[in-house]
Amino acid sequence: MYSSIWINSAQPDAADIFSRNLRYLLNRVNPRGKPLAFACIGSANVPGDSLGPLMGTILTRHGLLNVYGTMEWPLNALTLPHNMPLLKTVEKKYCLIAIDAAIGNPAQSGHLTLTEGSL
């Protein structure tokens, strides 16, 4: 079992640590190399909860397909229940990666976490 890893985004090598661990985790949970899909969860109107929709917008602007949740069409507490059947279907064909902000204690502020688990 892969345990969570926390990465301080202020570290100079944070991007390298994140990408190395993401690659490891994807190889572990997606050994057959299924295409990726992204569930970018959050509220576009709440600054502390907009990481998911913001990342979804950036991913779509870079031409990635199978991105669910953008600033224009957020995947949040109101829309997620309606979209769960779609995401369950997507999960059968794709390796689904969830991107979401989390509110934690002040010591966790600015940290990224990678965790294997269900949506």
Residue ranges and their predicted role:
Residues 1-119:
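N-terminal catalytic or cofactor-binding beta/alpha core of small enzyme domains
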